[in-house]
């Protein structure tokens, strides 16, 4: 039995079995407005053409990404990740105290995990900041 305040079957309420979401409206499809379609991808974007017909410069080759970064710990085997070395760990922190991601620091996955663990250890021992205080 449907409650009168919730809307019965096929009504535009928010709780009926065919209400199509919160917004009433008959039509099929889920979503929040009921929608007029069954959730299909409408063709209102127009013909965008093939990827290679979009223009741009015709030169092949690489984009100007610059030099590939190498992991400093893999390059120099004598260098170790040490949570007690504040200067080394600060290199991998932003000025806000966040850990710099791998794609920016250039670390390999193994050493990025070690750096992240070392930074977290340093934070627990109050060697490194969690955040930088606002003045």
From Swiss-Prot:
Any one GO cellular component localisation term in the record: cytosolic small ribosomal subunit
SUPFAM superfamilies with a match to the protein in the record: Ribosomal protein S18 (SSF46911)
Keywords tagged on the record: Ribonucleoprotein, Ribosomal protein, RNA-binding, rRNA-binding
GO molecular function: small ribosomal subunit rRNA binding; structural constituent of ribosome
GO terms for biological process, alphabetical: translation
Keyword Ribosomal protein: yes
Composition skew (Basic and acidic residues), residue ranges: 42-61
Residue span of region Disordered: 1-65
Keyword set includes RNA-binding: yes
Membrane-crossing segments per the record: none
Highest rank taxon of the organism: Bacteria
Ranges of biased composition (kind: Gly residues): 9-41
Cited Pfam families: Ribosomal_S18 (PF01084)
Primary role: Binds as a heterodimer with protein bS6 to the central domain of the 16S rRNA, where it helps stabilize the platform of the 30S subunit.
Entry similarity comment: Belongs to the bacterial ribosomal protein bS18 family.
Subunit record text: Part of the 30S ribosomal subunit. Forms a tight heterodimer with protein bS6.
Protein name, per record: Small ribosomal subunit protein bS18
């Amino acid at each position: 039995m449907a409650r009168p305040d919730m809307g019965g079957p096929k009504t535009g309420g928010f709780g009926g079995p065919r209400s199509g979401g919160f917004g009433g409206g008959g039509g099929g499809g889920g979503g929040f407005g009921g929608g007029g379609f069954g959730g299909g991808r409408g063709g209102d974007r127009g013909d965008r053409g093939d990827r290679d017909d979009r223009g741009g410069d015709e030169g092949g080759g690489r984009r100007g990404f610059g030099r590939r970064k190498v992991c400093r710990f893999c390059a120099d085997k004598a260098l170790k990740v040490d949570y007690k070395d504040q200067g080394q760990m600060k290199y991998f922190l932003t000025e806000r105290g966040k850990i710099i991601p791998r794609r920016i620091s250039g670390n390999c996955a193994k050493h990025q995990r070690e750096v992240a663990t070392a930074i977290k250890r340093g934070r627990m021992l109050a060697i490194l900041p969690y955040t930088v205080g606002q003045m």
